[in-house]
């Protein structure tokens, strides 16, 4: 019985040290974004297209006068929302643009409890974040 309880406690402790990953794909599912966070590393993101690496694991975060949002960040939540809009531009060849993407909002928290959201948009050919 003690062995089982010890194993459960150890697995709970190790779970908090394991990296958290969130995956979102473009509407055609060829372009894929992976956002990962682990207490031991800086948050990062990587991009693949048809299984081929386009952007290797790159650090994500910033250090500002408000707080350090680069080290020890914990991914506290995320939400994925599909976007499907049509808009018009009169100064380009194709004046009617049909934009489709999947938006990922990642909620991070630093060790001091300060929060920051990072918004990613993954379309069929592009990835953007702010």
PLM feature segments, named:
Residues 5, 11, 81-85, 129:
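Short, basic/low-complexity N-terminal boundary segments at the transition from targeting/disordered tails
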